[in-house]
């Protein structure tokens, strides 16, 4: 068995005295993730006077989050397996005296077996119960639950479908197009839209094999594919004392390959009546699954204003920042407080949506080349600032973008008093943002912020497909960007 090689633990001089109200707060949390989300969790812990322990692979040894945590430990083997080895992570938590583990998103965040392993070791898993993770992790069972409590669902097959004959029968009844979904899928993976019997036959086996490889479960199911919907999700917070609230919605319609690129809060198209109905539906589902901690209930909203439940993500979302910006509620802090057994100190009527927020995902990708992931070394880095601008990231000059992980480098979130102000602020922030050495989504995002349909709120999940002109942006650096890059190179050369 691999021995743990420790990155010399460094304890800060700050106090780790827990808050005085309620039962005792955690003294040390192991952050079972990396990059920007690890930094986000570490910051929340510091505000709660909780010590942190990070884990990292050799590929991440120079990561900012490794240096900012109070302690850090290398895990392996390889750059990814260590983050997925639940036994090793729980053993490490026990060895170093951590009393809780925060999984972030991705990796083990939706792994019920890992949550159970934490419980068995006396370690608090900062997230929902294993039972809730299991139920919401199976998209077929989640649909059945939603239907049983009266929440609308997209017409689909009743259970996992593997045999093509049953799939063809459903498609004939529902009408094309239909979408093939992995029963255990998520994050935009395991989805295939088909528009004919021939395409359905061709894709059933392929989708099943992909699902087996990605999720360890080859079962798939079919739904009627809704053309040009909005992808709307509601942020849930639920404590262990029966209180469940929602923090409003996010519009995540601007996507590539069913994966989100830009998130907006609140939605520009929801009426107060529809927001109330969808929020109540989200809470109904959370209550039915006996949910606690932070979670997201996702819906499709069709062009006629009908909404349909599609899934619940039992974890923290990448895009939680836009909700925090318009509600002034710290979601990660509340995750920790809830996991410690404390009641929420927020009532539904306390939640108000102030202004508008936009998040752009700054990915190391080439949008002109089908969003191909890019690697390399960051040769110049200057992040934007100013009122209403927030950066969540773990990138810096000389940072090497590894090929092993998600392409996300940073999240740029802005808030404005109005939609127009938020867009203007995002445009200005993207113009200020300098990140050289690897291709990123920054110039692509600049183009979107100037698109008239985007400015007018005329977008849905087909936005990128129906706006090919967005991909014709100029990749040449602006003169001021070159000045920054040259200055950074001179400073590095002279040892400044």
What feature does the model see in each segment?
Residues 5-8:
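Short hydrophobic alpha-helical segments enriched in small aliphatic residues
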Residues 13, 182, 400-404:
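Short, flexible, solvent-exposed loop/turn segments with mixed acidic/basic and small polar residues
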Residues 14, 21:
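Cationic, low-complexity basic patches in intrinsically disordered or flexible, solvent-exposed regions
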Residues 16-17, 134:
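A composition/secondary-structure signal for short, hydrophobic, low-basic-content segments
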Residues 22-297, 301-313, 317:
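N-terminal beta-alpha lobe that positions the nucleotide/phosphoryl donor
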Residues 282, 321-323, 327-496:
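Catalytic cores of soluble metabolic enzymes centered on carboxylation/carboxyl-transfer
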């Amino acid at each position: 068995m691999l021995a743990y090689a420790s990155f010399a633990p460094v304890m800060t001089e700050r106090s780790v005295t827990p808050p005085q109200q309620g039962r005792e707060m955690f003294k040390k949390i192991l952050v079972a993730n990396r990059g920007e989300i690890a930094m986000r969790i570490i910051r929340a812990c510091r505000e709660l006077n909780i010590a942190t322990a990070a884990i990292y692979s050799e590929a991440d040894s120079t990561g900012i989050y490794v240096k900012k945590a109070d302690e850090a430990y290398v895990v392996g083997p390889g750059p990814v397996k260590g983050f997925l080895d639940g036994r090793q992570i729980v053993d490490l938590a026990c060895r170093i005296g951590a009393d809780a583990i925060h999984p972030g998103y991705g990796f083990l965040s939706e792994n019920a077996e890992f949550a159970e392993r934490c419980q068995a070791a006396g370690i608090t898993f900062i997230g929902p119960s294993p039972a809730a993770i299991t139920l919401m992790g199976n998209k077929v069972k989640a649909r059945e639950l939603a239907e049983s409590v009266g929440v609308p669902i997209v017409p689909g097959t009743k259970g996992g479908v593997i045999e093509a004959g049953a799939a063809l029968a459903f498609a004939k009844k529902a009408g094309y197009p239909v979408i093939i979904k992995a029963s255990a899928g998520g994050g935009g993976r395991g989805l295939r839209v088909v528009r004919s019997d021939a395409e359905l036959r061709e894709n059933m086996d392929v989708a099943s094999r992909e699902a087996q490889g990605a999720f360890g479960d080859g079962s798939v199911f079919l739904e009627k594919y809704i053309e040009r919907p909005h992808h709307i999700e509601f942020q849930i917070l639920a404590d262990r004392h029966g209180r469940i609230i929602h923090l409003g919605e996010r519009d995540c319609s601007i996507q590539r390959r069913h994966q989100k690129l830009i998130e907006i809060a609140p939605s520009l198209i929801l009426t107060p009546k529809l927001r109330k109905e969808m929020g109540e539906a989200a809470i109904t589902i959370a209550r039915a699954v006996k949910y606690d901690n932070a979670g997201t209930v996702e819906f499709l909203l069709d062009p006629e204003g009908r909404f349909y439940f599609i899934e619940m993500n039992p974890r923290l979302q990448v895009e939680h920042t836009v909700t925090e910006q318009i509600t002034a509620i710290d979601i990660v802090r509340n995750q920790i407080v809830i996991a410690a057994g404390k009641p929420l100190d927020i009532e539904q009527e306390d939640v108000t949506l102030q202004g508008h927020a936009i998040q752009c995902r700054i990915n190391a990708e080439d949008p002109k080349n089908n969003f191909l992931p890019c690697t390399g070394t960051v040769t110049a880095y200057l992040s934007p600032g100013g009122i209403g601008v927030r950066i969540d990231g773990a990138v810096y000059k000389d940072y090497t973008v590894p090929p092993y992980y998600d392409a996300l480098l940073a999240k740029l979130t802005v808030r404005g008093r109005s939609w127009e102000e938020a867009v203007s602020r995002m445009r200005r922030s993207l113009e200020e943002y300098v990140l050289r050495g690897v291709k990123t989504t920054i110039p692509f995002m600049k183009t979107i912020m100037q698109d008239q349909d985007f400015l007018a709120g005329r977008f849905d999940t087909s936005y990128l497909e129906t706006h090919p002109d967005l991909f014709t942006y100029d990749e040449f650096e602006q003169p001021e960007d070159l000045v920054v890059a040259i200055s950074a190179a001179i400073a590095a050369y002279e040892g400044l």
